Amino acid sequence: NIHLIFGGQIKGQPHSIYQVYAAGNFIEATVETPYLQIGEAKYGKPILDRVITQETPLKEAAKCALISMDSTIKSNISVGLPLDLLVYPKDDLKTNHLLIIDEKNEYFKMIHETWGKRLRQIFSEIEDPVW
């Protein structure tokens, strides 16, 4: 029984990433589906759908993934820290960008506080419906 995201690159070839399902079938990330997600998807997915494109820089994609996870953690008691974030730049051929994010991580705390504050701020700036 397996459900995972698997990706990487063989030297001289394009990089790729796959989502593998328990039945053995898989899907590959494409231009139309520039990211893959496993686990609880309903809370953080709208953020990914609105931000991530094929052209999104890797650092912005990582930030978006963490904001998505923060939203999921906020809305689902069964999801929590720690988080493992591995960023694998094209043609790097090694894993130098691994973060294990726990309750003490200052960057994740900042994301949590800033995202919540700014979301409430923009919500209050949108006009109420006219009846």
PLM feature spans:
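N-terminal nucleophile
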Residues: N1-W131
